[in-house]
């Protein structure tokens, strides 16, 4: 009986986990802020405020990721540094493949929705992101872009 309950629980748990598909990839576009990081040993680090966001732009499974710094007027400070990325699928797992002049690496997309994302690197570190929007606390009434 206990085995049956355990098997049913595992089945339900696995059914709740949605695989990331090619149709989900456009959800990557935009600004993402790290909420927490979970190391492979289980250590968690929570981020209540981030000085930089990750900006993803992807078209036809290729694009870039850039670090941007939000400003109080709703704009972002950017530089010329970016990482080329390509989305690939291996054994039903979606990966972001990064490439710079100095290194190559990839991260598995564990989950992806309109407002949440989890990436896992080769060291089994989990990066939990939330979708972000420009910050405008100046109260100047101007719309941010």
Region roles according to the model:
Residues 28, 55-64, 89-93, 110-117, ...:
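Short, solvent-exposed coil/turn segments at beta-strand boundaries
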Residues 45-91:
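N-terminal glycine/threonine-rich, aromatic-flanked beta-hairpin/loop signature
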Residues 12-15:
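C-terminal motif of bacterial Sec signal peptides marking the signal peptidase cleavage site
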Residues 95-99, 117-120:
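Short beta-strand segments that buttress and anchor functional surface loops
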Residues 107-127:
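Short, compact, well-ordered microdomains
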Residues 120-145:
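Edge beta-strand at a domain terminus
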Residues 2-7:
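Sec-dependent signal peptide recognition
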Residues 18-33:
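N-terminal helix-cap/turn-to-beta initiation motif at the start of protein domains
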